[in-house]
Every structure is written in C-alpha cells, then in structure tokens.
Amino acid sequence: MDKNISNQRKSNRIQTIIKVVLLCDYFQYIGTATNCSESGMCIDTPHFISPNSNIKIILPIQEEELNLNARIKRTEKRSNIHDAIGVELLSPPPNYFGFIQNLQSSL
C-alpha cells in the first residue's frame, strides 16, 4: 500500500470476511466486506457501482442487522468478475462502533 494512502486513513482497517447486502438505486447486490474501520469499509462485489453513489449497507452482526448509509469513495478492478469498492460511512449508529471494538478486541 502506498505510504501516502495509509497516512490519509482516518482509522485503522481490520481484515474481515463478512457477507453484506448493498442497496443502490432500487437494486440489491451481494458483497463481502474485506476490511472495516470506524469510518469505512472495503467491499468486494461482482457489480460495478459508480463512485460518489450513495448506498445502504446491510451488515449482519449476531442476531441483528445494521443498516449503514455510505458513499462510494473509490472503485478498484480486482479481476474480470470482481470489483472492490471503498466506502465512507455516513453517520454510523453507535452499535456499529461497538461492532468495531469487538473486532479489535478479537485480534
């Protein structure tokens, strides 16, 4: 990773493999959150979603689902069939921060 990019991060990334649902413009997509932080996520998905799009992420944690509003900050081509999207979370709920703390404590 480019040092300049890592210095620009608002918070540390935690490696994950979590299935998520993405809602964008009346469409529903499946993705995998490959890392999470207090301010964003990287999600692998077989669907292209335009940068600057606002999306909703449904993140299953234990017996509940977190509904997170986010904005696509970047896209990255990973292969012929998969893209990665970097998202910025918009006003995540308090229980999302609890989820991140649980991930950090399990490292």
Question: For each predicted feature, which ranges?
Answer:
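Hydrophobic core residues within well-ordered beta-strands of beta-rich domains
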Residues: 16, 29, 55, 66-68, ...
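Short conserved beta-strand and strand-loop elements enriched in small hydrophobics
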Residues: 18-22, 53-65
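A residue-level detector for short acidic-glycine micro-motifs
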Residues: 22, 35, 72-74, 91
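Short beta-strand-centered aromatic/proline hotspots
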Residues: 31-32, 67-75
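Short, solvent-exposed secondary-structure boundary/capping segments
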Residues: 42-45, 78-89
